[in-house]
Amino acid sequence: MSKLIITTAISGSRRKEYLEKLEERAKKEGKKIKIYHVGQMMLDHSHFIGVNFSAENVLNAPPSVINAVRSAVFERIAGELPKTMKTYDAVFINIHGVFYWKNVFLRAWDNYYVSQLNPDLFLAFVDDVISIHDKLKVRKQWKKEK
């Protein structure tokens, strides 16, 4: 029986790297896992529909546009999930937890979709503040944010 796991964290906490290592290990052990990287899917979908999102500017977009793109991505995931759950041993939906941008906390997921997906596990990655700060200060989109 396949498990649905939602993974989350703040930027700079290395969750994507950990999930990539998990994927490598799963392959070595003969397990199939699927990882939906919601952030990348949002960038891909925005380009598909002609919205100029990039990792550097997405948080500057109007919240209604961000929410619409995120909803479209979650609709796609929800539509694929029945088949995906039959094909893989575990399915991960990887999404940011929250953003702190221009002195405002911005939500990174929609509670409606999280509750509709009914995950078996909700996993939050954490890291220490200094490590996260050091990682973010070298990324272009975070250099101006203090």
Where are these regions (language model features)?
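Hydrophobic, Leu/Ile/Phe/Ala-enriched alpha-helical segments that form helix-helix packing faces
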Residues: L22-A26, I77-M85, L136
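Short, intrinsically disordered, charge-balanced linker/junction segments flanking boundaries
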Residues: K143-K146
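Short, charged/polar "capping" segments at the starts of alpha-helices
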Residues: R14, L43-D44, I130-H133
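Glycine-rich phosphate-binding P-loop
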Residues: I6-L22
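Pre-Walker A (Motif I) flank of P-loop NTPase domains
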Residues: M1-I5
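ATP-dependent small-molecule kinase phosphotransfer cores
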Residues: K34-L106
